[in-house]
Amino acid sequence: MKPVISVIMLTAVLLGATSPCFGAVAIEGVAFEKTSRVGTNDLHLRGVGLLRYMYFIKAYVGALYMRPQDDAGQALAMTPRRLELQYFHAISAADFAEATTQKVKDNVSPETMASIQDRLKTFNALYRDVQPGDRYALTYLPGSGTELLLNGQSLGRIPGDDFAAAVFAIWLGPAPIDEDFRDTLLGVR
């Protein structure tokens, strides 16, 4: 009996070591690493979630990375963070730009919107059309700005702490794209 248990244990270890999700967290078949390096900061996975459109259409899955010492209330503060979103459907760059502008407006004051308007236009011009399986990453590093990446390739960086707070508010702010998704990313649900 002992050799059978040993073989089963060894098989489980070997399968786990070759699994694409080893050292990662998976949701809806999409793996996210448990840590992400931003500048000199090791960010830890805070939460992962699935965003549904009209309750039954899977739009995308996301993962939020923050420093371990930062709590959910600091999600929009001047602290390093990274949000990764992997899409299940094709979405045009124009649709991203339109949705980004609207959700930023929903989350910031008219004064803030006026002060970031030019940077928001520049940011929206960075968007590219995505296909199923593509992954955007939004990374903020204080003093360096907010960087948008598509499938690991940098598309550009926009300066300003105010800009970072406004853009991350789309998912993490008081009027997010979806409250359940926000709370899951923040690890409070």
Where are these regions (language model features)?
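Positively charged n-region of N-terminal signal peptides that target proteins for export
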Residues: 1-4
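Bacterial N-terminal signal peptides
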Residues: 7-17
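Terminal leader/tail segments of proteins
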Residues: 22-189
